């Protein structure tokens, strides 16, 4: 079974900009392909472990989210990774949709940390990655690519090692420790 991820984008300046950055992060990676499905995209691994990332297009917001849910239901798939992208005022809209199947929840919005209890209501055993203060696409996408490369290549995610690598990679970004 694939590692299925669902990423939520919202139709505002930050959501559109973050979506473009997400696509650009994966489009030049030989191990990944992007399939346009009109209201959403499917980013999937070409080699290694089978990883599928479903992301609604911000402009199609709810229609894209519904289309992803229908696509997953049709194939009897449930996301094990949930990713919120965009402004904090959309965070609750994402977190209320978290399925019990979620093993990892990534909240990349400003102050995402303050809504974590809501995420854990539906998936109490999930691991959480969240911003404390400022969320930024340059950090979110670098971390998401690194996480997905670990999954794709079958590496165990050892959190201390992962954070050490991220600190090294993002040390010049003023928001990393935020």
Name what the model sees in each region:
Residues 59-62, 73, 78:
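Right-handed parallel beta-helix
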Residues 23-36, 122-129, 153-155:
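Structural alpha-beta junctions
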């Amino acid at each position: 079974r694939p590692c299925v991820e669902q990423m939520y984008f919202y139709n505002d300046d930050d959501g559109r900009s973050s979506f473009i950055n997400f696509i650009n992060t994966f489009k030049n990676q030989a191990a990944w392909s992007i399939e346009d499905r009109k209201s959403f995209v499917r980013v999937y691994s070409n080699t290694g472990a089978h990883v599928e990332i479903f992301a609604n297009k911000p402009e199609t917001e709810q229609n894209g989210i519904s289309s992803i849910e229908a696509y997953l239901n049709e194939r009897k798939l449930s996301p094990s990774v949930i990713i919120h992208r965009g402004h904090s005022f959309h965070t609750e809209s994402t977190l209320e949709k978290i399925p019990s199947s979620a093993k990892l929840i990534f909240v990349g919005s400003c102050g995402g940390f303050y809504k974590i209890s809501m995420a854990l209501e539906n998936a109490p055993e999930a691991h959480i990655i969240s911003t404390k203060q400022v969320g930024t696409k340059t950090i979110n996408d670098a971390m998401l690519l690194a996480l997905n490369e670990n999954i794709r290549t079958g590496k165990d995610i050892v959190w201390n090692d992962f954070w050490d690598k991220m600190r090294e990679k993002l040390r010049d970004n003023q928001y990393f420790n935020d």
